[in-house]
Swiss-Prot record:
Listed GO MF terms: sodium channel inhibitor activity; toxin activity
Any Gene Ontology biological process: envenomation resulting in negative regulation of voltage-gated sodium channel activity in another organism
Disulfide bridge positions per record: 14-65, 18-41, 27-48, 31-50
Protein name as catalogued: Toxin Tma2
Family label: Belongs to the long (4 C-C) scorpion toxin superfamily. Sodium channel inhibitor family.
Length: 69
């Protein structure tokens, strides 16, 4: 298991944006939907962060987000 920023797909490499003020469990639900233990909205990056993701779940790499893939 790993703790990291989930991405939509490994090819696109785009994180899930969130709003710390209006999160309402969005990131926690998103992470649990990907079989993680829990998740939250990391305010400094305005992105969802997951704890306990399966090792094969796609997570952010050093490459840029490419929404056109």
């Amino acid at each position: 298991k790993k703790d990291d920023y989930p991405v939509d797909t490994a090819e696109r490499n785009c994180k899930f944006e969130c709003n710390i003020v209006d999160d309402k469990g969005y990131c926690d639900n998103l992470c649990k939907g990907r079989k993680a233990e829990k998740g939250y909205c990391y305010s400094l990056k305005a992105s969802c962060y997951c704890y306990g993701l399966p090792d094969d779940s796609p997570t952010k790499t050093s490459k840029r987000c490419n929404p056109n893939v």
